[in-house]
């Protein structure tokens, strides 16, 4: 049976950003020990270190607004590559910050986990 990679990517991103915005300390189940996050210039490996980094970000409230979401199959094994652009509203700031994020999703017992995650704010 063929996987609708666009639907999986959209569902994953909606879940990920809703969880991030409500309680990012609970994102650990989406990562594994071999997962890697590049957040701006910091590189971290492993679910524990990744969640520790995300939970320690210096803001209380955040809201992600997705502008674009593109997905492609990334291997014959069902991996999915996802590219997201959007805006972040942080704490009480009125001006949103633009961001880009890439996820490499790996199938895992009927679900997916994040193997690679690259996040970058876009300043311009």
UniProtKB/Swiss-Prot annotation:
GO CC term, one of those recorded: cytoplasm
Location of the NTF2 domain: 8-121
Subcellular location: Cytoplasm
GO biological process: nucleocytoplasmic transport; protein transport
Keyword list, A-Z: Cytoplasm, Protein transport, Transport
Described function: Facilitates protein transport into the nucleus. Could be part of a multicomponent system of cytosolic factors that assemble at the pore complex during nuclear import.
Protein name, UniProt field: Nuclear transport factor 2
UniProt organism field: Candida albicans (Yeast)
Lineage, top ranks: Eukaryota, Fungi, Dikarya, Ascomycota, Saccharomycotina
Gene coding for it: NTF2
